[in-house]
Amino acid sequence: MNEKSLRILEFYKVKDELKKYTNTNAAKDLVDNLKPYDNIHDVREHLEETEEALKLIISRGNPPFDGVYDVRQGVKMAQKGSILMPAQIFRIGAILKASRRFEKYIKAKGEGEGFRIIEDICQGIVLLKGLEDKIFISIESEDEISDRASSLLYNIRKSIRDKNASVRDKVNSLIRNYSSYLQDNLYTIRGDRYVLPVRAENKALVPGLVHDQSSSGSTLYIEPMALVNLNNEIKELKLKEKAEIDRILYELSKEIHDNIVVIKNNADIIWELDFIFAKAKFGSELNGNIPIVNDNCIIDIVEGRHPLIDRKTVVPMDVYMGKDFTCLVITGPNTGGKTVALKTMGLLHIMALSGLMIPARENSTVGFFTEIFADIGDEQSIEQNLSTFSSHMTNIINIINNSDEKSLILFDELGAGTDPTEGAALAVSILENLKDRGSMIVATTHYSELKAYALKSNGVENASVEFDVDTLKPTYKLMIGIPGKSNAFEISKRLGLPEFIIKAARENIASEALKFEDLIQSLQEKRIKAENYFREAEILKREAAKIKEKYEQKAIRLQEVRDKSITEAHRKAREIIRESKEEADRILKDIRELEKMGYSSSVKHELEERRKMLKDKLENVEENLYKAKSEDGQRLKSVKEGEEVFIPSLNQKVLVLSKPDNKGEVQVQAGIMKISVNLKELRAPKGSTKNTDKKLKREANLNLRSVATSVDLRGMDSIEAAYITDKYLDDAYVAGLKEVTIIHGKGTGILRSSITNMLKSHSHVKNYRIGEYGEGGTGVTIVELK
């Protein structure tokens, strides 16, 4: 892809932002080399690797890049067989450590997780744990060799510490002896040797070697003769220490050289991973998504935002083309909004084709273009001279000579810089030529001739950037299908141009042109209203979906509680049955004991009969426990819309809303809720025969439950209260209650109003009223049931 378009569309600024999320200079170099990939397979692969990195960050936290360095210089020296500096060895050890930790990071995946591309990259990591351990045992930091590097080094340093202690004892003794001759009662070190600060006039009184003097010459730094041998011994130990350190560095450098291929490979992998995860972090910061890339050059970007404009101020834009039209003409006043739309579209494509997430809604679609041409400049200047026109025409000629059906072409103020009539004619001809060869074109202009061209030409569509005449500013909302209006008269009027001048100007314009502009304004106003209605509908739709999801979850939880209660009741019933049987057996055993003791067998016979009757009755109850749920109504083979059926698991009648689908799922209305159940769970409603006595029907459905005469809704929201009330009224009706009390509290009256609205249409409610004095007043509603 041509470098000029990458520069004009500010892709380099995007890459500068991306670099902030890398850890190494090597990864920054990969960012510098980033540009759109040459084939769609590579684009999709690199987008997928970015998505995998984002999922890994979300599921496992940030990857282990701590302490990772750019070791290219050290690797290069090791390849030549050079002895490396401690810092270079330490950093290579950090790369080996990061490689090992990253392999562990990738392997620790959960069930069902898969990261194909990143796992494949990490397959190339070869662990060198032995060398890694040896490096970190030998080198504590970038400038310090550890005492543990070798036993010889440890012993040498111990000897140095001992000698230093001896020297300090000796020098402190000398300070006490020579204190009257010294500038200060302390020692210092010059060239690794202990010296005393002697006043110049006393140098003959302190025998020794002069190593230095102060800038004023008043102080001489003398090494007393008594310290010479001790200092010499320390110097010898220091030389031995250096020789041992050189040997250790040589051994480590040699081992690094022997494994340099593996080390370089591991380093390359870590830098590549650093680059990939930087893309994911950058995309996350943009609140971006992975776009869909298609080979048909279809564009459908939803709520796309320019990545370099502050998220708090940028206005999202929707743009689509490639199906019904391939040429989009954006018209309107010269306010900057059109250019932003143009740059946003081009830059988002470059980002997507470079494997980056784009700041747009999920499932936004971009086309795979092998070239993106951009002729964008500051064409909103008062001066439109020949040199400007020539410059743009040179760019346009280059575009015409190199574009094809895989090209996205962006023109800013096409045809500007020359006579408007000629410029408009040239613009139409250029667009027509590029459209015929299959290129995707987006052009901004303020020429009315191009609006007319877009209206009457196949494959060409008008668009405009919404402009607020009241504030004299663009809203930056792109409106496809509506041509832009120049708003010159309105803007001039707002800025204070006299009305008589504006009126005279209007008279100089043909009436057809004015009508055309007025029609455009009317279309814009209608479009804005329609979009507002659509947004409101979308908000309501999302809220309704949230409420539906909330109460479906509540229904599931209620059913779980209900099932658990039934199961627990069954368990307790079976426990009572078991204990009763055991008690009966114990009674029989006691009777036998009494019989052995001479008591009448008639007593035994009578009690045994009673025991048998108890056992039969208990067994019957136990059998009913297992049959109750499955035999609660006749199984249905089919249902129809509007039919009333019974769900045993809910112990509730429901209304069928749809026929069974291919999986046997039926949508039903249960109170205020719509739920899906399988046809197998539906039964014919109990007591459905017309001649069945109403009271008996209620008693049959009562199911031995005790229903309270009131329900307390205080503290609930309106929707939850309506659901609880609906269920309570069902239970109260089935239980045969004639009058119940709904406690909703006084508060703001919102809850009472919600309940009143529900009661108006409830099938079980005969009448209702606000509570009187002594009943709870306006804090309760008294309901009379049918």
Swiss-Prot record:
Which species? Clostridium kluyveri (strain ATCC 8527 / DSM 555 / NBRC 12016 / NCIMB 10680 / K1)
Subunit and partners: Homodimer. Binds to stalled ribosomes, contacting rRNA.
Q: Which UniProt keywords apply?
A: ATP-binding, DNA-binding, Endonuclease, Hydrolase, Nuclease, Nucleotide-binding, RNA-binding, rRNA-binding
In its UniProt entry, what is this protein called? Endonuclease MutS2
PROSITE patterns noted in UniProt: DNA_MISMATCH_REPAIR_2, SMR
InterPro entries named in the record = DNA_mismatch_repair_MutS_C, DNA_mismatch_repair_MutS_core, DNA_mismatch_repair_MutS_sf, MSSS, MutS, MutS2, P-loop_NTPase, Smr_dom
Briefly, what is this protein's role? Endonuclease that is involved in the suppression of homologous recombination and thus may have a key role in the control of bacterial genetic diversity. Acts as a ribosome collision sensor, splitting the ribosome into its 2 subunits. Detects stalled/collided 70S ribosomes which it binds and splits by an ATP-hydrolysis driven conformational change. Acts upstream of the ribosome quality control system (RQC), a ribosome-associated complex that mediates the extraction of incompletely synthesized nascent chains from stalled ribosomes and their subsequent degradation. Probably generates substrates for RQC.
Task: Kindly give the CDD domains that the UniProt entry links to this protein.
Answer: ABC_MutS2 (cd03280), ATP-synt_Fo_b (cd06503)
Q: One biological-process term from Gene Ontology?
A: mismatch repair
State one molecular function term (GO).
ATP-dependent DNA damage sensor activity
Where on this chain does ATP bind? 332-339
Q: Which family does it belong to?
A: Belongs to the DNA mismatch repair MutS family. MutS2 subfamily.
Q: Which NCBIfam families match?
A: mutS2 (TIGR01069)
Q: Which residues form the Smr domain?
A: 711-786
